[in-house]
């Protein structure tokens, strides 16, 4: 079985996603419960990096009913006017879109099956548009390339797979570069970054161009644009394929998704060895109680119905395939002294902690990048 088919098999079993095919082309990725959580975390981290933590003001926008999602300038007219008011008409400021549902008009005929999964016909775009001071846009173009590459690498189990292409200049003098990820079947282009300058305004009449004038000090200028774009589907597939690993374990191989803890759909789940009905019920009640405390603290937690009803190893298989960074291992001794084992997906080793400290300890572990 090929690598991508092994990944897709786990995706189906553990409710990540299923590709929907129409006429031998992938129309969309249909997400399951686990996949929805992974998508949500990817989008949240993209927004944090591109909106929340930026030095300049970044405003979100959303194109309704515009399936092709090509030139956004006119659709940004109202948003741009509002942004100028918020910024006292002064550059720089930016826009970000993480919700527009787009459709590829001319779906490329891809020979490699794996590549089709990265480019479904319908996708949710993640687009960032920086409106720069004219004298600073070139420097910002270089800066933004580095920032976007750092973002991909930060959440990767294999940061070395990401690279920037050489900057290309087209016939109109527009510069562009791509971020690519290396996989066993070849390179995937996962994000494009363009130095658009003022080209987006060229097809507008003078009255419409007036709308997009902003100030640098006392000067009125047309902003120079730097644009980057990827999609939620690309990011989903990148981190899915990046995180998948087959690791040696007890003279065997274990399949695992090594997600960054910020992206992992579930941060923690519970496991317990096979026990008699009475002990199994007590362990289940304890896991529910501890799980409620974690959930109230905002920690995505999974309470498994198989706790103490299947072998411990089979429960670990589930947590590894779900990419859960930490598994709280309960046993009969836990009921007596409150000590549990906290298993790491990376090392499979267990750290002993008291149940009273579990929530605060997990909060600390997942807080940092």
Map each language-model feature to its residues.
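TRNA-recognition modules of translation machinery and tRNA-sensing kinases, especially anticodon-binding
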Residues: 2-309, 332-369
């Amino acid at each position: 079985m090929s690598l991508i088919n092994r990944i897709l098999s786990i995706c189906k079993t553990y409710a990540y996603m299923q590709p929907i095919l129409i006429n031998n082309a992938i129309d969309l990725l249909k997400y399951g419960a686990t996949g929805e959580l992974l998508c949500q975390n990817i989008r949240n981290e993209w927004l944090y990096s591109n909106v929340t933590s930026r030095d300049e003001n970044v405003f979100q926008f959303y194109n309704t009913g515009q399936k092709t999602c090509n030139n956004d300038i006119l659709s940004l007219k109202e948003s741009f006017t509002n942004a100028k008011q918020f910024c006292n008409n002064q550059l720089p400021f930016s826009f970000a879109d993480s919700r527009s549902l787009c459709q590829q008009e001319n779906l490329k005929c891809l020979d490699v099956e794996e590549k089709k999964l990265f480019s479904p016909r319908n996708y949710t775009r993640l687009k960032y548009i920086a409106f720069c001071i004219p004298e600073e846009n070139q420097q910002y173009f270089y800066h933004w390339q580095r920032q976007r590459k750092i973002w991909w690498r930060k959440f990767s189990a294999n940061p070395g797979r990401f690279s920037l292409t050489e900057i290309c200049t087209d016939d109109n003098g527009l510069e562009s570069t791509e971020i690519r990820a290396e996989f066993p079947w070849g390179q995937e282009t996962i994000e494009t970054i363009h130095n658009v300058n003022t080209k987006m305004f060229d097809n507008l009449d003078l009255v419409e161009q007036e709308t997009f004038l902003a100030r640098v000090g006392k000067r009125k200028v047309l902003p120079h644009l730097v644009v980057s774009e990827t999609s939620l589907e690309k990011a989903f597939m990148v981190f899915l394929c990046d995180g998948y690993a087959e690791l040696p374990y007890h003279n065997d191989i274990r399949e695992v998704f090594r997600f960054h803890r910020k992206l992992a759909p579930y941060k923690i789940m519970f496991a317990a060895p096979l026990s008699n009905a009475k002990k199994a019920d007590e362990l289940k009640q304890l896991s529910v109680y501890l799980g409620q405390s974690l959930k109230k603290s905002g920690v995505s937690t999974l309470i498994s119905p198989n706790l103490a009803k299947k072998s411990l190893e089979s429960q670990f298989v589930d947590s590894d395939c779900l990419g859960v960074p930490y598994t709280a291992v309960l046993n009969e001794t836990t009921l007596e002294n409150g000590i549990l084992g906290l298993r790491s997906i990376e090392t499979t080793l267990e750290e002993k902690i008291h149940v009273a400290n579990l929530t605060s300890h997990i909060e600390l572990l997942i807080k940092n990048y």
